[in-house]
Amino acid sequence: MGEKLWEEYEEAKALGIETKPVLTGPYTLLKLCRYTGSKTAEDFTDAVIAAYQQVFEKCAAHRIMWLQLDEPALVRDLSKEDIALFHKIYENVLPCKKTVRILLQTYFGDVRDIYKDLTELPFDGIGLDFIEGKETVHLIEKYGFPKDKLLFAGLVNGKNIWRNHYDRTLNQLQQLTGKGIQTVLSTSCSLLHVPYTVKHETKLSEKYLDYFAFAEEKLSELKELSGFAENPSYTQESVYKKNCALFTEDRDCENAAVKKRLSEVTEKDYVRLPKRSERQQLQKETFHLPQFPTTTIGSFPQTKDVKQNRAAFRKGEITEQEYTCLLYTSD
């Protein structure tokens, strides 16, 4: 077992930063592995359990407060065997957590097949996706959420590039806290799916940039939303009003011509014309292809000379005729 996780944790701690290490969860790890021959996930379960037990023990030794285990495989359709495998893993590893608090994080969907099982196991926190998890709200309403656990509510979209609708998110947040659920506001998934920051978008008009939220901006949104959640008079805040205006005022970034064309689409437009037999004949007459045309599956490797010649041609340093001749003579 490597030392990277604990070395980086201690490095951050020395700088006064308390981090939350994140690992792929054991269930998802087993489900994502490729097995050969007659081997299955069950053949490696005991070894994986032993490895994560060691991880928990080392986290406790380093006095890590929170350890996040990502289990996105739980949003798939789960069989009884899948659920049994999940139980076997966590019933063996969770007793080793000692003082470490374990966050089970899910994303890219809801956990309808295993929600009750998750809430009954001794996790300290459970992360749920409220964006792509279409059944997440219904599951909480139907089965409730344990008062002794933290709900990491993925209410800010971690995959798209758009601003969060503060009013809508705060209403969802209030519904959760109104049920007595201890809630931590979070993104629906990791922010690795979006660009780093809007600050570097120097060629876009400010009126368009106002609608964008990349990774840094989404972190700012979380901070602002958290502040509003604790402020009874947040509706009077200028930041809140500015956000509301984004969703109440008409956007001039819409292309009227495209919108008009879309509104005129009919069922007939989904039928390709002319019919296939006529297209096939036209293609034969136009392209004169052999019976079995052969091509490559990609471009040919480019040598250093080819790249230099292309650059020279683009800069106007050589003519098209010279460039063509070089293509035929280059090694």
Regions found by a protein language model. Give the residues of each.
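Flexible inter-domain linker/hinge segments
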Residues: 1, 210-295, 302-305
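Conserved, mostly hydrophobic/aromatic
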Residues: 12, 59, 71, 118, ...
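N-terminal small/glycine-rich loop or linker at the start of catalytic domains
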Residues: 15-42, 191, 285-324
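Hydrophobic faces of well-ordered beta-strands that scaffold small-molecule active sites
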Residues: 19-23, 67-69, 102-106, 126-128, ...
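Active-site-proximal loop/short-helix segments
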Residues: 22-37, 63-86, 191-201, 306-307
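Alpha-helix-loop-beta-strand connector modules within alpha/beta enzyme cores
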Residues: 83-100, 222
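Catalytic-face loop-and-helix region of soluble metabolic enzyme cores
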Residues: 117-213, 224, 228
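Conserved small/polar residues in nucleotide/adenosyl-binding loops
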Residues: 328-331
